[in-house]
Regions:
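Terminal amphipathic alpha-helical/low-complexity segments used for targeting or macromolecular assembly
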Residues: 1-35, 133-162
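Poly-acidic low-complexity segments
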Residues: 18, 51-52
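Short coil/loop residues immediately preceding or within conserved phosphate-binding loops
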Residues: 32, 53, 83
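Left-handed beta-helix
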Residues: 39, 44-51, 59-60, 65-66, ...
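Short C-terminal domain-edge/linker segments immediately following a structured domain
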Residues: 78-80, 99-104, 141-142, 156-161
Length: 162
């Protein structure tokens, strides 16, 4: 079982107003995965965490859309003085060690590169990277589909040149 399976159980118990059991499941998530996902966060269908969700931290109220891929050590945090929390729309790919801070909206079909710090909203189809994150490209300009998993190629990569 992965962290999303535990979250789904926690969320189901939370929605049915069962008092103590969601906190017990949240404790299990912390002990097994070293992660924190509260029951009032919303994670859409088809979304998953790589490496079973190790070290994932979602602050209460975080919304994640459908078919999102969340990298290892993905975190969402609040940003003072705002009350709102991050919202990820559908088909967002988040790399490892990404932090999303503040009341930002990550629109559909966005790619966030690893080790990025996102503190501004990201438009549809953007590819962002850096600390703080900046737009480095657009998904529509890619000559391949990032969500597919092509077959492995034979051989080795060529050497670096100047």
């Amino acid at each position: 079982m992965d962290i999303i399976s535990f979250y789904r159980v926690e969320r189901w118990l939370f929605e049915r107003l069962i008092p103590v059991l969601p906190k017990i499941v949240q404790l299990l998530i912390f002990l097994i995965f070293n992660s924190k996902i509260t029951a009032d966060s919303k994670i859409g269908k088809g979304s998953y965490c790589v490496c079973k969700g190790i070290s994932t931290v979602l602050i209460p109220g975080t919304e994640i859309g459908e078919n999102c891929v969340l990298g290892l050590r993905f975190s969402t945090v609040r940003q003072f003085p705002y009350k709102e929390v991050p919202c990820l729309k559908n088909n967002v790919w988040v790399g490892p060690n990404v932090i999303i801070a503040g009341p930002v909206v990550i629109e559909d079909d966005v790619v966030i590169a690893g080790n990025s710090f996102v503190n501004r909203s990201v438009p549809i189809g953007a590819i962002v990277a850096g600390c703080p994150a900046k737009i480095i490209g657009w998904r529509k300009n890619l000559d391949y589909a990032i969500e597919t998993n092509p077959k492995y190629k034979d051989g080795r990569m060529p050497f670096l040149t100047k």
